[in-house]
Amino acid sequence: ENDMAGASTGGLDQNASMRCTEGHALLLDCRPELTPLENVSQQAFDLDKYGLELLVVDTQAPHQLNDGQYAQRRATCEEAARILGVANLRVAADGISKADDQFQALKETLDALPDVTMKKRVRHVVTEIERVRSFVRAFAQGDIEAAGRLFNASHDSLAADYEVTVPELDVAVDVARKNGAYGARMTGGGFGGSIIA
């Protein structure tokens, strides 16, 4: 996709397709220093145990991954990491999560950045890392309501801070939430496509 189609994409879809096993969710850690054997773990994801189903809803909203918006967000995050003096935003997120006052640590991190757009992108990335960690814990403990709230918070951050949703995604998420979904969020690269609920 990167070389042939000119789309600056990641590897989430490919990893999920090739490495996930039935009844599990794939927890993928994309830090560059990890090998393919180190960067993935299978998390038990037995929805039947809770009488739940995971729905994937295609909004039919077209999107293009080669229009530069994905690459622009990635470049903004890489520049933010450079400004913060860290190898990547995962390092910043790890520092924030270890702080005694995480809210203050996040505020100080964002205050070090030069513009509102960069602050929003970084806020999404570092809070999303913590949401993923919290989701894994909540689901492992059987706290489906907390897991659903984290799904919702993820979508809200993707809409407000990372700015990759479109009206069709937001409407589909809203409809799912109003009709009994514990949580709903967009999935994929954004700017169209599908939600999961």
Segments (PLM) and residue ranges:
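Glycine-rich, mobile lid/loop segments that gate access to catalytic sites or pores
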Residues: 1-8, 14
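C-terminal nucleotide
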Residues: 18, 22-183, 197
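Structural motif
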Residues: 193-195
